A protein has these predicted regions:
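Extracytoplasmic/secreted cell-surface and envelope-processing proteins
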Residues: 35, 121-123
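Alpha-helical segment that forms one wall of the substrate-binding/catalytic cleft
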Residues: 57-120, 129-139
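Secretory-pathway extracellular proteins and peptide precursors enriched for disulfide-bonded cysteines
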Residues: 14-18, 25, 127-128
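A general alpha-helical scaffold signature found inside nucleotide-binding enzyme cores
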Residues: 47, 127-130
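Cleavable N-terminal signal peptides of Sec/SRP-targeted secreted and luminal proteins
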Residues: 2-18
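Short, functionally critical alpha-helical segments immediately adjacent to catalytic or ligand/cofactor-binding
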Residues: 19-34, 41, 52, 89, ...
Length: 139
């Protein structure tokens, strides 16, 4: 029984490390992992480490938002805070992962992050996924 517990722990740690590498590579692809100011991207502003857009921030549950704080202010602040923006991405992925049947791991994370809820079905996310994959060597 101890052997199974150890094996489960090793698998859990391996998955956690792979996800960490995936998020780090997405950060590199998006901003060279720098807290960039907001900039226009495909008709709307993208901000911070992961180039988060306002609707994405709202979909991820507005982490870090203070009571009474305007959502735009919270979004810009969160996007420039690595921990807050990572929390946002994880919540977003958890919310929309069901939209990607047959996809898993870093491919699912990358395509949802880049293409939104339907990102796993969009041709335009393939090149983005290839950039992330070449960084981390993950699947």
């Amino acid at each position: 029984m101890l052997t199974i517990s150890v094996l489960v722990f090793i698998v859990y740690v391996s998955i956690a490390l792979a996800a960490r590498d995936c998020f780090q590579c997405i950060c590199q692809v998006e901003s060279q992992c720098q807290p960039l100011d907001c900039r226009m991207d495909m008709g709307s502003l993208s901000c911070g480490y992961f180039q988060i857009k306002l609707p994405y921030y709202q979909d991820c549950g507005t982490p870090g938002r203070h009571s009474g704080e305007p959502v735009e202010e919270a979004w810009k602040r969160c996007s420039k805070d690595y921990s807050c923006s990572l929390q946002c991405i994880k919540a977003y992925i958890n919310r929309y992962a069901r939209m990607c049947p047959g996809k898993g791991g870093c491919e699912l994370i990358s395509k949802l992050h880049n293409g939104g809820p339907n990102g796993c079905h969009l041709e335009r996310t393939v090149g983005y996924w290839q950039k992330v994959q070449s960084c981390c060597g993950c699947a």
